[in-house]
A protein has these predicted regions:
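Conserved acidic segment of CheY-like receiver
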Residues: 3-15, 20-24, 53
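Acidic, metal-coordinating helix/loop segments flanking the phosphotransfer/catalytic sites
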Residues: 34-52, 69
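C-terminal output helix
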Residues: 110-120
């Protein structure tokens, strides 16, 4: 199994972005590219070649679900697992995010010391899944 090393984190809140970046780099040992908007992420996507995308739901101009739809046009989402991050954790909303192709939803506020572990668990699940999406 390939080892996870490159994470694209799309988050408009600079303080959350900074905490997540430090946690993922220092605790997880990942290389993290942080983008403040969906448009910025789309511009950086191909050059960075992420192995995992961590995507905020609520952002101005292009929200997380809209960004995910645009990302799908550029990369094979089955090859690049996506997890949404949100404070909106109602079951219907989570179901909607998963129906868009996200593998999981990480709730905010998050524990910085657990974030790398959560991402690694989602990554491992994605690598163990068959092409049809079942284990």
């Amino acid at each position: 199994m390939t080892q996870l090393s490159r994470i694209l984190h799309i988050e408009d809140d600079r303080s959350i972005q900074a905490v997540a970046k430090v946690a993922l780099e220092a605790v997880g040992g990942f290389q993290v590219l942080s983008c403040a908007s969906g448009a910025e992420a789309l511009a950086q996507l191909l050059a960075f070649d992420p192995q995992f995308i961590l995507l905020d739901v609520m952002m101005p101009n292009m929200d997380g679900p809209q960004t995910l739809l645009k990302l799908r046009e550029l990369v094979d989402i089955r090859r690049v697992p996506v997890a949404f991050m949100t404070a909106k954790v109602q079951p219907a909303e989570i179901e909607h995010y998963l129906s868009l192709g996200a593998l999981d939803v990480i709730t905010k506020p998050f524990d910085p010391m657990q974030l790398a572990k959560q991402v690694r668990e989602i990554w491992t699940r994605s690598q163990n899944a068959s092409p049809t999406g079942t284990a």
